Amino acid sequence: MRISMMAETSPLERRVPAERPLSPHLQIYRPMLTMMMSIVHRLTGFANYFGTLLLAWWLIAAASPNGYAKFQWFASSWIGRLILFGYTWSVIHHMLGGIRHLIWDTGRGFGPKEREWLVAANLVGSIAITVVLWIFIILTTGVG
């Protein structure tokens, strides 16, 4: 009986890589509106968590005149209004995106034209509703 001094190769070491295509990488995709709006939908969902802190601050500030005065000072500053405007758009955009996803859950709107129309309607609708809402707020409250 002869003992070989050479180490045997394991089945993993003898394995030959399979000849199959690799998944395409994100860098080869041309950005599409649906892809961008999917990312924006996730970002607005994330931003809504932080915007809800503003809502909590407003509710907590209502407990004292001094606290409410501080919130009013922030909300009436240009940066406060910009943040509130952005939060308004974020909530509306995320809501319309949720409606778009509900439509997709029914199995409708997956054709190329329908998909692009829904995404464009989501974007245009969220901007239009936000602007109309803020015009209404400015006209009815005299904030300007």
Which residues make up each language-model segment?
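Membrane-embedded alpha-helical bundles that constitute the cytochrome b-like, heme-associated redox core
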Residues: 1-144
